[in-house]
Each structure stands twice: as structure tokens, then as C-alpha cells.
Amino acid sequence: MNRLKKHYEEIIRLDMIRKFNYVNPHMVPKIDKIIVNMGVKEAASDKKQILAPLLILELITGQKAIVTKAKKSISNFKIRKGFPIGVSVTLRGNNMYEFLSKLITLVLPKIRDFKGVPFTSINKYGHLAIGIKDLLVFPEIESEYDKFNRVYGANIVIVTTAKTKKEAGVLLSGFQIPLNKR
């Protein structure tokens, strides 16, 4: 069993039951999935530009990434329906906990001038959105730095089953995600 999953089952879950007085054990919030997404605007003009972000996401998540395509044409952005515009990975189960552990212990502390994730990054549905401007902070990418011609960023969304912002904040704080109450 993963370290974070065990921590959730043995400590966080019990703390949340005490704090929020849930009557049913299935009401206790948990992390449902983690979505890692990269938008690649250059891919609209040159389809080969999608390969590097695809490889990066597969390296950092350990799971096959999918290419996201434009749902409709937008002439101002020179995008046609069906053009590749990004890559995405949805993590669940053990892969999710492994990625979260890596994010908390290795990646977030390496980000320069990182003062924590703002509490306002949690939306009303209890989902936390984190933007990382430079993926070179991931250990898998550091050693492969010379293979990529530019710096890539990504959006990471941690989807929880929490009903309120407060529940989500307590849950994510239990996982040692540094939240700032700004």
C-alpha cells in the first residue's frame, strides 16, 4: 500500500470524521483523481510539436498520455476542429498516490520562490488547481533537459469528493499540501 494512501486511511479519514461529524463513512471526502494537462499552441501549426509534451507527461506520470483535440474551429487562433491542441493524463489509484507523493515531497519544494498553494486555488466543488510554469523541477525531466528545445508548463488539478472548500482544505492539508490562507 502506498505511503499516502495508508496515511489517508489511518489518520486523515479519522480526523475528518471527528472534525465534521459524518454519519456515514462514505461521506468522508477523498482524492478521486489527478488530471495533468498541457496546452501546446504550436501544435496547431506543426503537428510534430505535440511529441515533446506527450513524452514529458508520460515521463512524469508513468502513464500513457492522450492528445486533446480542438472541439470546434476558432479562426482568431488559427485552429480547426480536430487539430491537436494539448496533452492530458488522468491518474487514479496507486499511480495517483505515487504522483501526489512526488509532487509534495520533490517537486513543490524545488519551485523557486514557492510560498505555498493559495487557498483560493480550491474552487467551490473542492478541486485544487496548481499551475507549474517549468516542468524541469520534476526529477525525470531534470536529467533529460537537453532533449527538449523549450521550457514547458502544466496544469495539475486534484479532484476531490469534498462538498465544500473547507472540507477540501482540511483534506489536502492532511496530505501535507502547503496551502496558504491568503
From Swiss-Prot:
Protein's name in the database: Large ribosomal subunit protein uL5m
- Pfam families for this protein: Ribosomal_L5 (PF00281), Ribosomal_L5_C (PF00673)
Q: Which GO terms describe its molecular function?
A: structural constituent of ribosome
Compartments reported by the entry: Mitochondrion
Task: List the InterPro entries hit by this protein, alphabetically.
Answer: Ribosomal_uL5, Ribosomal_uL5_bac-type, Ribosomal_uL5_C, Ribosomal_uL5_CS, Ribosomal_uL5_dom_sf, Ribosomal_uL5_N
Q: Which UniProt keywords apply?
A: Mitochondrion, Ribonucleoprotein, Ribosomal protein
GO CC annotations, alphabetized: mitochondrion; ribonucleoprotein complex; ribosome
PANTHER family (alphabetical): 60S RIBOSOMAL PROTEIN L11-RELATED (PTHR11994)
Stored NCBIfam families: PRK00010.1
Per the record, the domain of life is Eukaryota
Q: Which family does it belong to?
A: Belongs to the universal ribosomal protein uL5 family.
